[in-house]
C-alpha cells in the first residue's frame, strides 16, 4: 500500500493556474499534489553572444527552491555564493526538455528564460517544473503572438511533460511523492512529447538493479501519466 493510499497507476491531483505573475510574459503555478512550483517565462529580444546573427532564438531554464519549501529550512544558494550541482543539473534538464519542442528558427533572435521556483516540495519537483514550464512558455508565446512577434503554432511544435515512476515495496508506481521517493528501490524520470516521442529518461536503482521487465512496466506507467498531463495542459491553455 502506498503511503498516500493511491493506486499504483494513480497520479496526485494536478493543477495549472495561469497568469499568476503580472510582470512575466508567461506564468503558471503548477501543483502535483503537495509539490508546488511557480514557473515564469521571460522574454529578451536578444540571444546569447554565441547565437548572434544565426537567425535562431534560444530557450533556457533556471531552477531554485525557496528556503522553507522543505521540512527544514534550506540555506539560500545565493548566500552560499554558488549554485549546487543538483540545481545546475536540474535546470539543464528542464531547459533541454523545453527546447525539444521549440523551433528556434521560428522564434527568431530572441531568448525566453523559464524560471522554476519551488514553493513547496513533496517529490517530483523537476517533473512538475518541466510540465508547468511548458504552460508558462506557451503563455509567453501567446503574449508575443498578440504583438505579432511570432505564431505560437510555428514556434511550439508539440507538448512536453514529465513524470516520475519508481519501484516502491516491489511494485512499479506512478508519480512518487517524497515518502515514496526517499525509500524507493528504483527512481526514474520520464520526459515525453504529446506525440509520444521520448525526450529524456533518467533512471537509477537504489541498491538492487532493476530488470528490463520492470523498466518496461515503468515506461508503460510513464506513458499513461504523460498522456494525462498533456490532456491537462491542453485544457489549461485552451
Swiss-Prot record:
| Pfam families, per database record | RNase_PH, RNase_PH_C
Keyword terms of this UniProt record: Nucleotidyltransferase, RNA-binding, rRNA processing, Transferase, tRNA processing, tRNA-binding
Among the GO molecular function terms of this UniProt record, one is:
tRNA binding
Q: What is its EC number?
A: 2.7.7.56
UniProt keyword tRNA-binding present: yes
Keyword hit for tRNA processing = yes
* GO process annotations (BP): rRNA catabolic process; rRNA processing; tRNA processing
* Residues binding phosphate: 86, 124-126
Q: Which reaction does it catalyse?
A: tRNA(n+1) + phosphate = tRNA(n) + a ribonucleoside 5'-diphosphate
Q: Which NCBIfam families match?
A: RNasePH
Question: HAMAP family attached here?
Answer: RNase_PH
Q: How does it assemble?
A: Homohexameric ring arranged as a trimer of dimers.
Query: What does the UniProt record say this protein does?
Result: Phosphorolytic 3'-5' exoribonuclease that plays an important role in tRNA 3'-end maturation. Removes nucleotide residues following the 3'-CCA terminus of tRNAs; can also add nucleotides to the ends of RNA molecules by using nucleoside diphosphates as substrates, but this may not be physiologically important. Probably plays a role in initiation of 16S rRNA degradation (leading to ribosome degradation) during starvation.
Describe the family membership recorded for this protein in Swiss-Prot or TrEMBL.
Answer: Belongs to the RNase PH family.
* Protein name from the UniProt record: Ribonuclease PH
Record the organism: Brucella suis biovar 1 (strain 1330)
Amino acid at each position: 500500500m502506498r503511503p498516500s493510499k493511491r493506486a499504483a497507476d494513480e497520479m496526485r491531483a494536478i493543477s495549472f493556474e495561469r497568469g499568476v505573475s503580472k510582470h512575466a510574459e508567461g506564468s503558471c503555478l503548477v501543483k502535483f499534489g503537495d509539490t508546488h512550483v511557480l514557473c515564469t517565462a521571460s522574454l529578451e529580444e536578444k540571444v546569447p553572444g554565441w547565437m548572434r546573427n544565426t537567425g535562431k532564438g534560444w530557450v533556457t531554464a533556471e531552477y531554485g527552491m525557496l528556503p522553507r519549501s522543505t521540512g527544514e529550512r534550506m540555506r539560500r544558494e545565493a548566500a552560499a555564493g554558488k549554485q549546487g550541482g543538483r540545481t545546475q543539473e536540474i535546470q539543464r534538464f528542464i531547459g533541454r526538455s523545453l527546447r525539444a519542442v521549440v523551433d528556434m528558427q521560428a522564434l527568431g533572435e530572441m531568448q525566453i528564460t523559464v524560471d522554476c521556483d519551488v514553493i513547496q516540495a513533496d517529490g517530483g519537483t523537476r517533473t512538475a517544473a518541466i510540465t508547468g514550464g511548458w504552460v508558462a512558455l506557451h503563455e509567453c508565446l501567446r503574449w508575443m503572438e498578440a504583438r505579432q512577434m511570432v505564431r505560437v503554432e510555428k514556434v511550439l511544435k508539440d507538448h512536453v511533460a514529465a513524470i516520475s515512476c519508481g519501484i516502491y515495496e516491489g511494485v512499479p508506481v506512478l508519480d512518487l511523492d517524497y515518502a515514496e521517493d526517499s525509500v524507493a528501490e528504483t527512481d526514474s524520470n520520464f520526459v515525453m512529447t504529446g506525440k509520444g516521442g521520448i525526450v529524456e529518461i533518467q533512471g537509477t536503482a537504489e541498491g538492487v538493479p532493476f530488470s528490463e521487465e520492470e523498466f518496461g512496466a515503468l515506461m508503460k506507467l510513464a506513458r499513461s501519466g504523460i498522456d494525462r498531463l498533456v490532456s491537462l495542459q491542453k485544457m489549461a491553455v485552451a
